[in-house]
């Protein structure tokens, strides 16, 4: 693992990497705990190379905050990163990032003569921004600088800092920074207390009392799952539980939209319950996402594992949309042919995709999705021999894959779907309620494929099929965009000795009751 402390060293490292390798980036302030490590492990799983930054950012600390006593554990952090599979740690000094020594003084951190990134005031004046003016300007300034230096494909931030996550996502959209921002679930101690570098300021008794934050949020979540959506009802539930620990001093309790941070009167689709309080002198934050959408079932696995058949039948049985990702690639292939665009010209492909309005709808009378492109139904047209022969080359284009991942995520906003592919649970729907990794041995998949081809009148060699399937697995697992990987929280189902009905039964048992 490389230890880099200068911008020049970081740039040299990035230039030494193959351009086709994906880069994951986890920005931290060090003093790593299990929450950081879970994000780092996710980045290592998702990318070819992972870079972690360790930088205690002076610009995000206000006067009389804990900048000077914030724990610095660099050697320990580097060892944890190395153990987790990190490829490089970037640990610059404030001066290296253009923060003068004078600007590191308590009274002058935010008045240095440097460019400052200012996120939308409506996002920074609420929640933590009320008591920490200027904090998110400091965060946004350094995060922007780090993203420009590292130039990652994906950057990972914890959901515990939900306001920061929303602001960074907005910043990346507004400034057109070419990076995917990945939110990582909050990691908790056995008591429910969210991991935080500031937990070490707490005594054991204070930690126990602080666990009321999560209990109070869970109490509101229980009401939400029972159908309560009104702001007052949900906040009252939190306050009732908080009242059991009188030593806790509440700073704020809010129900907001998780993307815009606008306060909500009630939850229609999703809401963020956010809380900040002090236990002793230590300030703690926590939150829970309340999601009213119908469930998403993400089924991944290698080619030939039976995903398509199972996914269609699961969708029909549960009355959910079958998100036919294969049909989406076919529809894009049809559209490019209609536009007369050569797939050799990726910029022209990108332009054409911006004019492609793709819509899917379940076909209640059959197993297929009905597909429209710009209000023209193409359900049958995309199954033509010409489209079938061209779809593989179109699917290999990074710009097409990225476009369709965004389209698939759009369908996920309302939920109520079953999707199959190779990256549904890792890339497209990382927060799916049910994640399944459906697999089978190469030998079994080759046997199934041989039977299918023989039914169609073809004679095939089993050994050759096994070789082709093994090579397809290798290509799918190593492709630059959306490689085939099992999600950490996916349930693996080995189908070698299972019927379709048995596989479906196993998946249906994973769906939450009442969904």
Positions of PLM-derived features:
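ATP-dependent NMP and nucleoside kinases share a basic, alpha-helical "lid"
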Residues: 166-169, 175, 379-456
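Conserved lysine of the Walker
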Residues: 307
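Short beta-strand-centered segment that lines the nucleotide-binding/catalytic pocket of NTP-utilizing
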Residues: 318-335
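Nucleotidyltransferase catalytic core that binds NTPs
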Residues: 2-249, 254-256, 260-262
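The conserved Walker
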Residues: 303
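Short, well-ordered beta-strand core segments
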Residues: 50, 89, 155, 417, ...
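Small-molecule kinase domains that catalyze NTP-dependent phosphoryl transfer to phosphate-bearing small molecules
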Residues: 91, 363, 408-414, 422-431, ...
């Amino acid at each position: 693992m490389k230890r880099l402390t200068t911008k020049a060293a970081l740039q040299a490292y990035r230039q030494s990497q193959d351009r086709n390798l994906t880069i994951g980036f986890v920005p931290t302030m060090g003093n790593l705990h299990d929450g950081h490590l879970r994000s780092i492990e996710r980045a290592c799983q998702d990318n070819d190379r992972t870079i972690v930054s360790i930088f205690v950012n002076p610009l995000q600390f206000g006067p009389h905050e804990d900048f000077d006593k914030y724990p610095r554990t660099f050697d320990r952090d580097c060892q944890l990163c190395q153990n987790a599979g990190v490829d490089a740690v970037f640990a610059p000094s404030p001066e290296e990032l253009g923060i003068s020594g004078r600007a590191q003084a308590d009274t002058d951190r935010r008045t240095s003569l440097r460019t400052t990134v200012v996120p939308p005031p409506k996002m920074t004046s609420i929640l933590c921004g009320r008591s920490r003016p200027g904090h998110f300007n400091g965060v946004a300034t350094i995060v922007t600088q780090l993203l420009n230096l590292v130039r990652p494909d994906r950057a990972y931030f914890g959901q515990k800092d939900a306001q920061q996550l929303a602001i960074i996502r907005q910043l990346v959209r507004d400034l057109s920074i070419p990076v995917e921002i990945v939110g990582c679930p909050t990691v908790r101690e056995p008591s429910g207390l969210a991991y935080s570098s500031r937990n070490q300021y707490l005594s054991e008794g204070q930690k126990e009392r602080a666990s009321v934050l999560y209990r109070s949020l869970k109490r509101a979540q229980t009401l939400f799952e029972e159908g309560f959506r009104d702001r007052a009802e949900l906040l009252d539930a939190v306050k009732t539980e908080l009242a059991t620990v009188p030593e806790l001093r509440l700073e704020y309790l809010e129900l907001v939209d998780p993307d815009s941070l606008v306060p909500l009167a009630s939850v229609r689709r999703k809401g963020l319950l956010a809380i900040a309080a002090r236990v002793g002198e230590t300030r703690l934050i926590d939150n829970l996402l309340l999601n009213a959408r119908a469930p998403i079932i993400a089924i991944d696995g290698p080619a030939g594992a039976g995903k398509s058949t199972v996914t269609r039948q699961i969708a029909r049985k549960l009355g959910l949309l079958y998100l036919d990702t294969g049909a989406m690639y076919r529809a894009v292939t049809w559209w490019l042919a209609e536009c007369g665009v050569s797939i050799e010209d990726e910029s022209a492909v990108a332009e054409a995709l911006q004019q492609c309005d793709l819509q899917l709808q379940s076909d209640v009378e059959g197993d297929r999705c009905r597909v429209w492109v710009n209000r023209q139904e193409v359900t049958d047209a995309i199954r033509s021999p010409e489209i079938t022969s061209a779809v593989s080359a179109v699917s290999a284009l990074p710009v097409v894959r990225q476009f369709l991942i965004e389209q698939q995520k759009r369908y996920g906003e309302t939920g109520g779907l079953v999707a199959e592919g190779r990256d549904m649970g890792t890339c497209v729907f990382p927060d799916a309620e049910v994640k399944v990794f459906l697999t089978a041995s190469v030998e079994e998949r080759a046997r199934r494929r041989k039977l299918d081809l023989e039914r169609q009148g073809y004679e095939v060699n089993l050994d050759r099929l096994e070789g082709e399937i093994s090579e397809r697995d290798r290509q799918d697992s190593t492709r630059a965009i959306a490689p085939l990987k099992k999600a950490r929280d996916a349930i693996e189902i080995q189908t070698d000795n299972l019927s379709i009905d048995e596989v479906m039964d196993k998946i249906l048992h994973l769906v939450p009751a009442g969904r």
